[in-house]
Regions:
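Short loop/turn motifs at secondary-structure junctions and domain boundaries
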Residues: 90-95
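Glyoxalase I/VOC metalloenzyme domain signal
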Residues: 1-3, 9-30, 39-83, 96, ...
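A cross-kingdom feature marking solvent-exposed beta-strand/loop segments within repeated
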Residues: 84-89
Length: 225
C-alpha cells in the first residue's frame, strides 16, 4: 500500500500554509483560497478549509538522519513528549522505527518515522527534501475488529503487525492505515482519537484507489464527508 495523496481540513488555512510551506519548507504544488497542497517527497498532502478533530499521519524519513531530523524539527516546532518527558522514541517494537512527533496549527498530530528495516539511507544535512513520503494515516473507527475484517475482505488491505481491538495497522511497511477505536489516545500525548473527514488516494500494486469515510460502511453513521 502506497499513500499518494491525503486531504485533511484546517480552520486557518493561512496559518497552516505558512507552517508547511515556510516553516517546514515543503513545496506548494497547488494553492487556492479554499485549499492548498504541499509535496511530501513522492506524496502530496492537502488541506481544505474546515473545523475537524485532530488527525494523525506519519511521514517517512531516512533511517540515517534521525538525530539531524530531531535537531532540524526542534528548531521549527515543539516536539511532543510522553508523560516522562521523552521526545524521541525507538528504535524498538514491531515497527523497529525511530519516531518524532509534533502538531501543526490545526492540531493534527504529525510524525516523522525512520524505519530501520527499510533501506532509506541518505547523507545529511537533514532538510525538507528528506521527507520521503506519507506512510501512515490514523483511521479512527467504532469497532477495530469489524473495520479490519471489512478492509481485508473488501479492499485486500491486510493486518501486518498483529491484530488488536485497540491498534491494528493494515497495509504494509511502505504505507499503512493505523486502525484504532474512537477515544484511544494518540501517542505520545494521549489526545483521544476521533473520526475525521478525509480523502486518501493510495496505490495497491499498479492500481490507484480512493478512500473517503463515505466508502466505509463502518464510518457512515459518523456523518463524515
Amino acid at each position: 500500500m502506497r499513500l499518494d495523496h491525503l486531504t485533511l481540513h484546517a480552520p486557518d488555512l493561512s496559518a497552516q500554509r505558512a507552517f508547511y510551506a515556510l516553516t517546514l519548507g515543503l513545496p506548494v504544488c497547488h494553492d487556492t483560497p479554499e485549499a492548498f497542497t504541499v509535496q511530501v517527497g513522492r506524496s502530496r498532502l492537502s488541506f481544505r478549509q474546515g473545523h475537524t478533530p485532530a488527525a494523525h499521519f506519519a511521514v517517512d524519513i531516512p533511517r540515517t538522519l534521525v538525530t539531524q531530523a530531531q535537531a532540524w524539527l526542534e528548531a521549527r516546532a515543539p516536539l511532543l513528549a510522553d508523560p516522562a518527558g521523552q521526545v524521541r522514541f525507538g528504535p524498538d517494537g514491531a515497527f523497529h522505527s525511530s519516531n518524532l512527533y509534533f502538531r501543526d496549527p490545526a492540531g493534527h498530530i504529525a510524525e516523522f518515522i525512520a524505519r530501520h528495516d527499510l533501506p532509506f539511507d541518505h547523507a545529511g544535512p537533514f532538510g525538507s527534501q528528506h521527507a520521503l513520503h506519507l506512510s501512515e494515516f490514523g483511521l479512527v473507527v467504532p469497532d477495530v475488529t469489524g473495520a479490519v475484517d471489512w478492509l481485508e475482505a473488501r479492499l485486500g488491505l491486510r493486518a501486518w503487525v498483529g491484530r488488536s481491538p485497540t491498534f491494528t495497522p493494515v497495509g504494509g511497511a511502505d504505507g499503512s492505515l493505523i486502525v484504532v477505536p474512537r477515544g484511544r489516545g494518540w501517542f505520545p500525548i494521549g489526545l483521544p482519537g476521533q473520526p475525521v473527514p478525509f480523502h486518501l488516494t493510495y496505490r495497491q500494486g499498479q492500481v490507484e484507489r480512493h478512500l473517503t469515510p463515505a466508502d466505509l460502511p463502518f464510518l457512515r453513521p459518523q456523518g463524515l464527508t
